Amino acid sequence: GGEAAPAEHSTPLSLGEGHGGEAVHGGEAVSDEASPTKSGFYGQFGGAYVPEILYKCVHDLQDAYLPIIESEEFKQEFRTLLRDYAGRPSPLYYAKRMSERYGCQLYLKREDLNHTGAHKINNAIGQILLARKMGKTRIIAETGAGQHGVATATVCALFGMDCEIFMGKTDVERQHPNVERMKMLGAKVHPVTTGNMTLSDACSEAIRDWCCHPEDTFYLVGSTMGPHPYPDIVAKMQSVISEEIKWQLQEKIGRDYPDYLIACVGGGSNAAGTIYHYVDDDRVKIVLAEAGGHGIDTDYTAATIHCGTEGIIHGARTLVMQTDDGQIKEAFTISAGLDYPGIGPMHAYLAQQGREKVLAINDDEAIYAGYELTRTEGIIPAIESAHAVAALRKLSFKPSDVVVLTVSGRGDKDMNTYLTHKDMAKEYGKF
């Protein structure tokens, strides 16, 4: 049996719900829309639907997280590690040649330049500090592309903590370098052989492990999914991305907001971080790219916003790819990091409200965009990030439009995929 907190339908969500409208780093109060109600709802999405054995774990975390992450001590420690260990701020880079191609002013938020090669480290640092302050000694995590697994194994090595990573066997095979990195960092990697053997199954397995070790174990969730308070924790840890975009734009163009924000979305953490400080700013259009796989009219897709219906997955009410009788469908995409049959409840809500425009990007479009960015700017993006780059082709801009696109990770882990599918890259694939 799970706990269903009452859905609250007030829009916009009032700050009176006691969910603290402050960003992790202080600064101005953050939009209502980016934070859930006290019971963890964004509109009708979210909440905490967990088995009874996890009830105490989840409640303890709900009670503990805000006082800890809003404390000066935490903020100071978090900021210092982001700066000195992760290498933040990440650059906001004016992509001149891509700007000329698309007739806009394109800036790339370079999360690929963080330590470990993606945005995932921001959240891993924040959550391990939280776990330590809560007295937990063992860390578990799920991973798809392996980036969150690597980031988690990295911070566990940094703090000398036990680390176990659950990863679908399919992903273990297609992301081999990251598996070896995790092992080198001292993590134990469990290949998951249930279901489709990808990210969703890894999450289920991690939750099972958490059920068996509720006292000493902290589940370090990698995306804005799972039971409340995880979507809010991850969004707050990643909000450093949009916090930096604000001052970096101010420095570069004399105003602190773009006309467009573009990011890829699977569970939704880099997207949440990219839009966090802009959700209530109507001057900013938000465009997210989800994984279309072979196409949204096929059974081989991971486009949850396009193809999902309301349901419960991994402890949250959100949009889910499911059969008519509520069985969760397998998600298909070339990108291990977007291979999730659900979506963070914050994004389900914002998409439903029309605040986010969500485009489905197919495998071939993503591969093409990865080659295009590589040949045009000398930046090899992760296949996940290439989905965001592909969104540029589907939009029309004015020359004055300022567009900020988050390159969520680097493409080293995907070289095999890029080479195997180079025929999808048209003129770029001939080498």
Regions found by a protein language model. Name each.
Residues 115, 131-168, 256-270, 286-289, ...:
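A short, small-residue-rich loop immediately preceding and capping a beta-strand
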